[in-house]
Amino acid sequence: MVVAVYSLTHDGISAAIIRAHDRGVKVRVLTDSLQASSRYADDELLDAAGVPLRRDTQTGSMHNKFIVGDSKGKGLAVLTGSFNFTKSAAQKNAENFIVLRLQYVAREYLAEFERLWALNK
């Protein structure tokens, strides 16, 4: 599972990522470096749990919001939309999030994640 998200401050989402990692799911997380420096960011929680994490310092703003993961043995699925992984997005904002199970779309998202991951060694 790969996660590219601009802002990650929702403790429940961070906990779910950590639980997946603890179950042996191969997880990598990429966040925006400016947002990661926020006192509310959960980057340090993920780091402490051993989740591979990189902060994007190579683009103006890493404003992506997507997850690519296995869809219970049915191939890859992409979750994407306007939703940042924040409490405000979950509780206050008008946001959207969609699940895509088109394999060619999932491969494109995965390729973009790999490109950004490699840029931010």
Can you annotate each of these PLM segments?
Residues H10-K121:
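PLD/PLD-like phosphodiesterase catalytic module centered on the HKD motif
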